[in-house]
C-alpha cells in the first residue's frame, strides 16, 4: 500500500466507478481493480461493493476512505508548502459571472509584475452548483459561490456534505444596471417601471420570476451584454455591485430598485486540508480590496 494507491481509492469513491476513475487516472481498469483487491487483502476489509451501475463503499470502506483522504490531504499540504515559485504564477478558480470578481482578477494580474512570470491560470465562470462540484472533484482549487441569503442553510448542507471549507466574502442586494441614455436614469425605479424595458438575463440568477409578464433575453456573453445596454437604451440587467471605474468606462448607471430587495451572498470555498498558496492569498486580498470599493 502506498500513497499513490490511496489516491486511486479516493478517485474510485468520487466517481463511484472503477472504469471512470481509471480513465481519469490514465491507467487501465484491470490494473486499478488489481490495486483495489491488493489493498483490500492487505487491510483485511472489503472497501467497495460492486453493483451493475458501479461501486459504493462498504461501512468499513467508508471509515478506511475517510482516513485515506486525510492522508492524501496531508501530503498535498506538504507539497503546497514548498510549491511557491517566484517565477511562476499559478491560480485555479471557478466563480460566478460578476464584474467585481473579474476586476479583482485583473488587479491581481497587475500586481508585482505578475504578467512577466510564467503563467498557469485557470479562471472559469459558471453557476454555484457546478463550482461546488468542480472544487470537490479537484478540477479547481478555489471557488466562489453565490446564492440568496434565504437559501444559505441549503448550500451549507451541500458544502458540509462535500467537506468543503467556506468563508463569507460579501453580502449585497442585486442592483439594476442601465446606460446613461436609459429613460429611467434619473428616476427612482420600482418593479412596475421595468415592465416596458427588456431584461438582459445572464447566469443562473433569476430576480424576476414572472417570465410571462416581462420582456427578457438570455445573453451569456459579457461583451454583447454591455453592447446591448449601450445600443438599446430601454434594456437593463440585474447585477451585483460593480466598480465605479467599470461604470465610467462604459457610461453605465447603477440603480437600486425601491420595492425589490433580495440579499445575496458570495462565499469563497476550497477543499478541507487544501493549503492556500501565496498566489491564492494574493488573489483573495485583491478580491477583498475590490469588495471594499463597491460596498
State where each predicted segment sits.
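Hydrophobic hinge/microswitch elements
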Residues: 136-140, 204-255
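A late-sequence structural motif
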Residues: 255-295
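Short beta-strand-centered segments that line the small-molecule binding cleft or hinge
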Residues: 107-111, 128-174, 253-254
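N-terminal winged-helix
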Residues: 30, 85-133
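Flexible hinge/capping segments at coil-to-helix
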Residues: 158-199
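A short LG(V/I)-centered, amphipathic sequence patch enriched
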Residues: 40-57
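Secondary-structure junction motif
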Residues: 101-107, 152, 184-216, 277
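Short helix-boundary/capping micro-motifs
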Residues: 10-28
Amino acid at each position: 500500500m502506498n500513497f499513490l494507491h490511496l489516491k486511486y481509492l479516493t478517485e474510485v469513491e468520487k466517481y463511484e466507478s472503477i472504469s471512470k476513475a481509471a480513465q481519469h487516472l490514465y491507467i487501465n481498469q484491470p490494473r486499478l481493480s488489481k490495486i483495489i483487491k491488493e489493498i483490500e487483502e492487505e487491510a483485511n476489509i472489503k472497501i467497495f461493493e460492486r453493483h451493475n451501475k458501479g461501486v459504493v463503499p462498504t461501512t468499513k470502506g467508508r471509515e478506511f476512505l475517510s482516513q485515506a483522504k486525510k492522508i492524501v490531504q496531508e501530503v498535498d499540504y506538504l507539497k503546497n508548502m514548498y510549491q511557491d515559485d517566484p517565477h511562476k504564477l499559478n491560480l485555479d478558480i471557478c466563480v460566478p459571472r460578476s464584474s467585481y470578481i473579474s476586476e479583482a482578477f485583473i488587479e491581481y494580474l497587475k500586481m508585482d509584475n505578475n504578467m512577466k512570470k510564467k503563467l498557469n491560470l485557470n479562471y472559469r465562470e459558471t453557476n454555484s452548483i457546478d463550482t461546488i462540484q468542480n472544487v470537490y472533484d479537484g478540477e479547481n482549487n478555489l471557488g466562489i459561490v453565490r446564492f440568496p441569503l434565504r437559501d444559505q442553510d441549503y448550500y451549507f448542507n451541500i458544502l458540509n456534505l462535500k467537506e468543503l471549507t467556506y468563508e463569507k466574502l460579501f453580502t449585497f442586494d442585486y442592483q439594476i444596471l442601465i446606460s446613461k441614455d436609459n429613460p429611467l436614469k434619473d428616476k427612482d425605479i420600482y418593479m412596475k417601471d421595468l415592465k416596458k424595458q427588456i431584461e438582459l438575463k445572464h447566469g443562473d440568477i433569476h430576480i424576476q420570476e414572472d417570465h410571462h409578464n416581462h420582456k427578457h433575453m438570455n445573453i451569456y456573453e459579457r461583451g454583447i451584454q454591455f453592447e446591448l445596454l449601450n445600443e438599446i437604451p430601454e434594456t437593463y440587467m440585474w447585477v451585483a455591485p460593480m466598480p465605479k471605474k467599470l461604470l465610467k468606462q462604459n457610461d453605465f448607471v447603477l440603480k437600486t430598485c425601491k420595492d425589490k430587495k433580495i440579499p445575496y451572498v458570495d462565499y469563497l470555498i476550497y477543499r478541507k486540508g487544501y493549503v492556500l498558496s501565496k498566489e491564492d492569498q494574493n488573489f483573495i486580498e485583491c478580491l477583498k480590496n475590490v469588495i471594499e470599493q463597491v460596498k
